[in-house]
Amino acid sequence: MTTIYLIRHAEAEGNLYRIAQGQANSSITDRGERQIQALARRFADIPIDAVYASDLYRTCATASAIYKPKGLPLHRRRDLREICVGVWEEKTWGEIARQDPAQLENFNHRLHLWHVEGAETPQAVQTRLLAAVRDIAAANDGKTAAVFSHGCAIRLLLAALQGIPLEELGKTPTGSNTAVSLLRAEGARIQVVWRDDASHLTDPAFTQGCTVKQRANGLEPGLYFRPLAREQAEFPAAWAGTSGAPPAGAPVLAGYLDGTPVGAVAFDDGRESERGCGWIPLLAVAEPWRRRGYGVQLIGQAVMHYRPMGRDRLRLPTISMLIQRMRWN
């Protein structure tokens, strides 16, 4: 018999910024790093003989909670990857909701009907994950393995193992980041002993402010973004007086939720470029939308804007400037 701990990766940028990451690589957030530390404490006294992870960064980084303290090698496997979401990759969920609402509804509630250009089918993901787990179980007979994968992939695998048809997948939860499921494999049979346990995340800071709730019926809403013409917004006087207006031609993105403007972020590509910084001269969230997780989605757009330029950090004005109110025409 083989014991397998099946573990979802820690919080990554796509989770935080509300971006469809699928098989795209993304970094672990600060909260994700704390989740990894909590996971390491959980497994400190649990014997593990082998550690496997998908070859994406977020799973490999999460797997360090186990393989590094125990001095084990990490076995990277492409067949443990998340479902490929095709043309949705690296789009915001808000943009997807605007462009393809019918398929997003299918993705959230009727995954067996979902398909977009370039994407894997859910059935293909189940076949891929089942084969991977069976191969790992056979290679570790009589041992215990930790296997790191992704939210949708794990959900599909557990449904297949529990005999839940794809038509009823919407009734099952998606485990939290670093949630653990326990499998026992003997021959061709793989039993789900328990699933989606995140009891190691005892500190509210591990989950407070998360933009994705663990629920069966879908995802929290995200923003979509459009370029904002300077004449469309009156920049806050206090901000302009301190930092000066963005240089001519500097891009400004407005974030919208269901057609309603929520906030804006501006970029100054030339400022502090020699220091590897991405300068954000303005980050503004309108009063009704503050403290609801939308400001960090604006930050996510700055990350996506500056990372291809090789910038490895962001700089913002003083904190008093970060929450200035934006007025919209």
Residue spans of the language-model regions?
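A short, internal acetyl-CoA/4′-phosphopantetheine-binding micro-motif in the GNAT/acyltransferase core
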Residues: 79, 283-290, 318-320
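Acetyl-CoA-dependent GNAT
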Residues: 230-282, 286, 299, 305
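Conserved GNAT acetyl-CoA-binding A-motif
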Residues: 306-318
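Phosphate-handling substructures
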Residues: 70-128
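Conserved active-site alpha-helix within GNAT-family acetyltransferase domains
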Residues: 157, 296, 308, 320-329
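Active-site-proximal alpha-helix that buttresses catalytic centers in soluble enzyme cores
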Residues: 5-72, 76
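Conserved acetyl-CoA pyrophosphate-binding loop and the N-cap/start of the following alpha-helix
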Residues: 31, 289, 293-301
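Acidic, low-complexity terminal tails and accessory targeting/binding regions
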Residues: 87-95, 160-230
